[in-house]
């Protein structure tokens, strides 16, 4: 079953990916309904999520990057208790737990070579995420091939440096792109 937040992602072509708490105010001024939190620790992640919610946005937290969390299922439970609307992870175990809890799940993978791309397809099939995020994004042919072969929609992220990169990824079939480049958050 398709998670309701996938529609929000479809309507948010560029997702702000916040790498430090100091970047969050700028991300909340950008257009769109979703913010990716690629920062935080066990002491402040709840407050960061609350700030995103106060701006009427959805908070999707990169579980692997929250300082103090172990790569275990209980970490996903903790993030849900903190109010996260979804999780990002490179770990299929955490993706499966997020799905069990009803969170939006984003499986993040790195397309460093053809073997990694093949592995991504298998992991995505096994973990059944709502969305797959592939990095780096400026590879339109790879984005196109993955977007056509995956069951889950594809987010392109990493190394997005200009509007042309955004448009190329979207034209290649990506659902949306995620970027930490503030200049691109409102294109």
What kind of feature is each model-predicted range?
Residues 30, 82, 101, 126-127, ...:
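Structural motif
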Residues 35-39, 93-94, 136-142, 158-187:
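Glycine-rich phosphate-binding active-site loops on the catalytic face of alpha/beta enzymes
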Residues 13-16, 35-37, 59-63, 87-89, ...:
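Hydrophobic faces of well-ordered beta-strands that scaffold small-molecule active sites
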Residues 104-142:
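Glycine/Thr-rich beta-alpha phosphate-binding loop at enzyme active sites
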Residues 1-61, 67-69, 83:
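Conserved N-terminal beta1-alpha1 strand-loop-helix module at the mouth
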Residues 45-65, 73-74, 81-82, 92, ...:
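Alpha-helix-loop-beta-strand connector modules within alpha/beta enzyme cores
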Residues 17-28, 71-78, 114-125, 162-166:
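Short, acidic/polar
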Residues 27, 91, 132, 169:
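Conserved, mostly hydrophobic/aromatic
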């Amino acid at each position: 079953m398709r998670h309701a937040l996938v529609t929000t992602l479809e309507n948010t072509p560029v997702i702000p990916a916040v790498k430090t708490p100091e970047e969050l105010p700028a991300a909340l001024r950008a257009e769109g309904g979703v913010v990716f939190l690629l920062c935080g620790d066990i002491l402040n992640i709840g407050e960061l999520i609350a700030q995103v919610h106060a701006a009427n946005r959805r908070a999707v937290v990169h579980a692997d990057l929250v300082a103090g969390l172990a790569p275990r299922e209980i970490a996903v439970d903790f993030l849900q208790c903190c109010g996260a609307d979804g999780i990002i992870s490179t770990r299929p175990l955490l993706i499966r737990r997020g799905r069990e809890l009803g969170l939006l799940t984003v499986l993040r993978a790195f397309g460093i070579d053809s073997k990694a791309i093949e592995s991504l397809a298998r992991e995505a099939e096994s973990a059944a995420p709502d969305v797959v995020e592939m990095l780096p994004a400026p590879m339109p042919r790879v984005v196109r091939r993955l977007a056509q072969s995956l069951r889950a929609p594809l987010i392109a992220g990493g190394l997005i440096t200009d509007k042309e990169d955004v448009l190329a990824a979207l034209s290649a079939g990506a659902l949306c792109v995620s970027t930490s480049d503030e200049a691109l958050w409102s294109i």
